[in-house]
Amino acid sequence: MVNVVDLRKTYRTSHGLDTIRVDFSGQGPALSYRPKSVNAVDGISLSISPGEVLGLVGESGCGKSTLGRVVLRLLRASAGSVEFDGVPILHQPEKALRHFRRSAQIVFQNADSSLNPRLSVGEAIERPLALFNLVPTADRRRRMEALLDMVRLPRSYQTRYPHQLSGGEKQRVAIARALATEPKFIVCDEPVSALDVSVQAVIVNLMADLRDEFNLAYLFISHDLAVVAQISDRIAVMYKGGLCEIGVTAEILRRPRHPYTEALLSSLSVVDSENESRSGRLRLFGSIEAEDEQISGCRYQARCPYKVGAICETVTPPLRQISQGHSAACHLESVPANGVAPSYANPPRS
């Protein structure tokens, strides 16, 4: 249903102190700007089948939300292609995207900013029905109440406003609004990260039930691997704009094949013995934002305890198939599997 090939989104900046070059030689201008490029999405390819949940996990700043927005054409791609039901959408005129806009929706992280404070719950849910002329005016209220039932909110809530709702209730309204157009595919962009842990589980279970009932496909984005594992059929791990690993959820959790995935698993509060790393638990040092701009080689080399030498610094590892439906982008998959212990070629950074 959704097919993404070599998708890229590059941001170019030409202002700011980090892009200023000072020339003291007197041969050129004293100050000049050096444009800087940031590859938020860097050559990603993936597919999502009808009724499938693909979880996309990674730290803040890795580009996962940007990927979701580019797939929905809320942001313009720099290169690559996205097909929905076999139809390319990236270069279609907006008028030709009406079917796509109805069939593909998004649930944002912060319902406070995605819900209009001036619209009641009922008005917010009815608005897509009017925009797409999905049901006669006389039937809109009945349809809106049915949507409230789907997300397990009392019908009396239709007269309430966002400020009168809890965080979980607001997110239920956002889900109901997304369901109003009867979509096939929903991008769930950190839909539970702003909620209490107890509420997170309830919302994730609700979304899983809706998937089963309506055969929905989700791109479920989160920084929390435990949340992603709860609902996903497959998991894709993203780092600095690219995919590190992708595979069936059970396989990713049981036998991760990329050091970054291992580190994410090790960061969970409860780790099964089968999920231990190659040589015990891995700690994740540093942050994406703290790293220098990468020129070549593996995008994870600055933090990887398994760094094997020059190949990691000079050659970008391809996403290599390890087993049926399981791929990882790591040079360790091409060296003898004799139990490589962490070398800490990069000293751990706090």
PLM regions with names:
Residues 14-32, 248-349:
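Charged, flexible cofactor/metal-binding loops and thiol motifs
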Residues 22-29, 88, 139-156, 265-266:
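Conserved ABC ATPase "signature" region
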Residues 80-88:
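Conserved ABC transporter NBD signature motif
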Residues 161-165, 169:
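Conserved ABC ATPase signature
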Residues 180-184:
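A short, proline-enriched helix->beta-strand linker immediately N-terminal to the Walker B motif
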